[in-house]
């Protein structure tokens, strides 16, 4: 019996086949769920042949994690008594949460931090953002989507005036070149990668990544760029296009601005290629790819850097300069979590609902009127991002479907802040963060929930319950509404809340915006399965290419109506290697892992496995213990030390240490430095060294800190 059948029962349950949306990644595949007849949970999961996104295709991991997640379920509210978490009633738990938030708000609304997630439904995300901004009034509101997507979002806004990817899945079959940069869709987006490989059969698939990933292993070519060298490589390619007269001059002059400023700041091809760690021939070959209709995909390898916005902008620059913005072309950011897009559109920390500019007075008034609160109640800036939020040491932290104790960079520092705060954790699974909580609120997961989600190509789909919510567990939306009733009465309906009513409220607030969802309703989604925004009318949706074929004109939602080239030059890497820390640590996904691993691992392994090149092992053999062929060392950064098992792997270049993002200890090592434009952390690069596991690792670490 699947482990997510939480309680055996003989009561009646939903047993019909229920169409819904996969909760694993942002491809947004339609699923069909069948609830169990004799228990709470899902009996079977399969792809939905009627869903327009995937037409029945589904990856094994999405099916497996929907039907049988490996995490430990939360089943009752918990509160901390005498240092221990003990079961309590919902009324007691909610009374504690409400009273504590009210007390903090009376002192300063910014004493309350609210952290949401790309795992929420649109409705829960919208309600949480409304409560945080208009009820609590805090600027310290964000979601874990900023940890992975903020740099791409910021680059899109800077280029197009909107966080709306120009390409859609419809473009994949029409592209002749698929340039995958700092992403691993073979692991992270298997269904989408199947489409990419099918299209590349008659074209080219090229991967830019320091590591030979699963995607790179089946590509036509793999460019092993130096860690942190992505921006330099993109600039080298653009410089080559300029030097060889391969710019689409007509498109650039008519539809863009800022090109001359970019060109004047470009380094020479030779200098940029050297910084990227590639040959001049490689630059020439990559530039030649752009002659054909090209989709440039990128992911966390680009975004999670102090240079993330600059690098994503440089990739957009390549599309603009080469005219790759029509069918079968364009800059395509690959979103990770299932509802990252929805979290941004519904309640983004950087904009109001519907991409309304946060600091624009007209939009602030419109939001205040829609929410029936004074404009003065709304915070006057969008906040410092997740890392900055914890740096401010709020007295109350409320997390919803996220695990900051394992997911934040410099996790030890995050632990100290969370330990000193009144911590409220709302989740379906027992996460690392739960262990520090003062109150734990058990929430329903997707197979038990009603709502909607948005995938990476802006398509809205329904999430439907195929099983009842177990006793002791509540819907995210109802929990948020209960807190609102205690903190800001009247702001949200009292639970139980109608998800469709909340969606209608959200959709109405998007009317006239670039993310117009006002033509989408539950009734429409019940009939069509999925609708792509902008959809301003009940029978409309859009490809959103910023192009009107009836007039042959490009129009972008920028002040000038033109797309903008990025002139950002990027930040220096915060931790270049040196004599004390000669190795570079990077992080990445594994095929069977998900985020911090809460729902994809049943037991925490004793120590993570670090993939390293055999040459690296040989170079630092004095710091490696070999016990009957098992290699172990201690990885030490400027923040922490972690014992690891070494996996000799030729796919990882010499000098690089690769750790999985799914292990809860990984982010003890990573740097809290953030991109100054997006506030996204620099997860993909920090300096480390190896220390023999029998050495006093902690003392070694402290000594290093003193000497720095």
UniProtKB/Swiss-Prot annotation:
Temperature-activity profile: Optimum temperature is 80 degrees Celsius at 2.2 and 3.1 M NaCl, and 60 degrees Celsius at 0.9 and 1.3 M NaCl.
Subcellular location: Cytoplasm
UniProt induction comment: Repressed by the presence of ammonium as nitrogen source.
Activity modulation comment: Inhibited by cyanide and azide.
pH dependence: Optimum pH is 9.
Annotated cofactor note: Binds 1 molybdenum-bis(molybdopterin guanine dinucleotide) (Mo-bis-MGD) cofactor per subunit.
EC number, as in UniProt: 1.7.7.2
Swiss-Prot/TrEMBL keywords: 4Fe-4S, Cytoplasm, Iron, Iron-sulfur, Metal-binding, Molybdenum, Nitrate assimilation, Oxidoreductase
One of the protein's GO biological processes: nitrate assimilation
Needed co-factor(s): [4Fe-4S] cluster; Mo-bis(molybdopterin guanine dinucleotide)
Annotated pathway: Nitrogen metabolism; nitrate reduction (assimilation)
Region (Disordered), start-end ranges: 586-613
Catalytic activity: nitrite + 2 oxidized [2Fe-2S]-[ferredoxin] + H2O = nitrate + 2 reduced [2Fe-2S]-[ferredoxin] + 2 H(+)
GO CC annotation: cytoplasm; membrane
UniProt binding sites for [4Fe-4S] cluster: 22, 25, 29, 59
Recorded GO MF terms: 4 iron, 4 sulfur cluster binding; ferredoxin-nitrate reductase activity; metal ion binding; molybdopterin cofactor binding
Pfam families membership: Molybdop_Fe4S4, Molybdopterin, Molydop_binding
Domain 4Fe-4S Mo/W bis-MGD-type: 15-73
Family: Belongs to the prokaryotic molybdopterin-containing oxidoreductase family. NasA/NapA/NarB subfamily.
Miscellaneous notes: Enzyme stability and activity depend upon the salt concentration.
Assembly description: Is probably a monomer. Initially characterized as a dimer of proteins with a MW of 105 and 50 kDa.
PANTHER family in the record: NADH-QUINONE OXIDOREDUCTASE SUBUNIT G, RESPIRATORY NITRATE REDUCTASE
Function: Nitrate reductase is a key enzyme involved in the first step of nitrate assimilation. Catalyzes the reduction of nitrate to nitrite, using ferredoxin as the electron donor. Can use reduced methyl viologen but neither NADPH nor NADH as electron donors.
Protein name (database record): Assimilatory nitrate reductase
Species, as recorded: Haloferax mediterranei (strain ATCC 33500 / DSM 1411 / JCM 8866 / NBRC 14739 / NCIMB 2177 / R-4)
